[in-house]
C-alpha cells in the first residue's frame, strides 16, 4: 500500500511539474519579439492603430456574417458627429440566402422580440415586416458572397438602447449585438 501511495505521490508531483510547462513557450517568444527595430514595431503598429480608428469620426462600419450564423462583432459604435452612418453587411459564407441568409435589422432593445415575431411571416420582404415603425434601419437579406448596406441618421439612436440582429428565422438568438452611440 505504501508503494502505491508513493507512486500516486510521484504522479501528482510529475503532473504538477508538467503544468508549469506553458510558461516556457512564453519565455521563448520573448527573443523573437526582439527582432530588428526597423521591421517588427512598424509592422505591428499599423494594424493596432487601424483597429482603434473606427471609434470617432468614422461614419461607416462593416459587419461580416458567415455560414455558422455568426457576426464578427457584438457592438457597432456610431459616432454622434456623423450626419449619416453607413453599415455594410458582408456575407463571407457560400450558402444561398434561402438556406443561410443574413440581414441586419436595428431597433430598440425592447422592440426586438416583436420585430422577430412579425418578421417570421415576411419572407417576401427579407423577414422584416413592411413599414414596421419599430425598425430604425435594415439591410436586405443576402446570401454567401453578397453584401448590402444601410444608412441611418445617428440622431435616431439618441433615445434608448438599440440592438442589431439577423431576422432570418432562428438566427437572432446567436446573431445580435448592441448599437452604441458614441461621442
UniProtKB/Swiss-Prot annotation:
Its cofactor is Cu cation. It comes from the Bacteria. Binds 1 copper ion per subunit. Keywords: Cell outer membrane, Copper, Electron transport, Lipoprotein, Membrane, Metal-binding, Palmitate, Signal, Transport. GO terms for molecular function: copper ion binding; electron transfer activity. A lipid is attached at residue 18 (S-diacylglycerol cysteine). It is a lipid-anchor. Transmembrane segments: none annotated. Residues 27-51 are annotated as: Disordered. Residues 57-183 form the Plastocyanin-like domain. Its main location: membrane. SUPFAM superfamilies: Cupredoxins (SSF49503). It holds the Pfam family Copper-bind. It is found in: Cell outer membrane. Residues 1-17 form the signal peptide. A lipid is attached at residue 18 (N-palmitoyl cysteine). Gene3D superfamilies: Cupredoxins - blue copper proteins. InterPro entries: Azurin, BlueCu_1, BlueCu_1_BS, Cu-binding_ET, Cupredoxin. Cu cation binds at residues 102, 166, 171, 175. GO terms for cellular component: cell outer membrane. This is Outer membrane protein H.8. It comes from Neisseria meningitidis serogroup A / serotype 4A (strain DSM 15465 / Z2491).
Amino acid at each position: 500500500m505504501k508503494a502505491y501511495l508513493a507512486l500516486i505521490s510521484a504522479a501528482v508531483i510529475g503532473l504538477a511539474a508538467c503544468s508549469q510547462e506553458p510558461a516556457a513557450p512564453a519565455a521563448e517568444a520573448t527573443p523573437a519579439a526582439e527582432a530588428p527595430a526597423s521591421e517588427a514595431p512598424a509592422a505591428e503598429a499599423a494594424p493596432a492603430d487601424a483597429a482603434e480608428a473606427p471609434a470617432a469620426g468614422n461614419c461607416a462600419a462593416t459587419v461580416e456574417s458567415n455560414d455558422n450564423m455568426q457576426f464578427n462583432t457584438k457592438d457597432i459604435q456610431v459616432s454622434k458627429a456623423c450626419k449619416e452612418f453607413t453599415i455594410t453587411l458582408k456575407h463571407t459564407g457560400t450558402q444561398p440566402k434561402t438556406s443561410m441568409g443574413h440581414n441586419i435589422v436595428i431597433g430598440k432593445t425592447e422592440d426586438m422580440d416583436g420585430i422577430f415575431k412579425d418578421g417570421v411571416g415576411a419572407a417576401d420582404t427579407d423577414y422584416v415586416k413592411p413599414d414596421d415603425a419599430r425598425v430604425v434601419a435594415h439591410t436586405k437579406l443576402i446570401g454567401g458572397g453578397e453584401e448590402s448596406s444601410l444608412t441611418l441618421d445617428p440622431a435616431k439612436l439618441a433615445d434608448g438602447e438599440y440592438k442589431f440582429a439577423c431576422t432570418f428565422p432562428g438566427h437572432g438568438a446567436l446573431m445580435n449585438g448592441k448599437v452604441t452611440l458614441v461621442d
